[in-house]
């Protein structure tokens, strides 16, 4: 169990986990609020 805990706390595993979390969060935000970036700029 200690070896698994050591492996999961290494930098590449934590970085990939963080990137997957951020990507999923951005996908869900875009699903509920589509085109949020384009709505902030007025279109004339």
From Swiss-Prot:
One of its GO terms (cellular component) is photosystem I. It holds the Pfam family PSI_PsaJ. Keywords: Chloroplast, Membrane, Photosynthesis, Photosystem I, Plastid, Thylakoid, Transmembrane, Transmembrane helix. The keyword Thylakoid applies. It is a single-pass membrane protein. PANTHER family: PHOTOSYSTEM I REACTION CENTER SUBUNIT IX (PTHR36082:SF2), PTHR36082. This is Photosystem I reaction center subunit IX. The lineage of its organism: Eukaryota, Viridiplantae, Streptophyta, Embryophyta, Tracheophyta.
């Amino acid at each position: 169990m200690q070896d698994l805990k050591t492996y999961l706390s290494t930098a590449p595993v934590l970085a990939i986990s963080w990137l997957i979390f951020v990507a999923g969060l951005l996908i869900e935000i875009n699903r509920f609020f589509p085109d949020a970036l384009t709505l902030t700029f007025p279109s004339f």
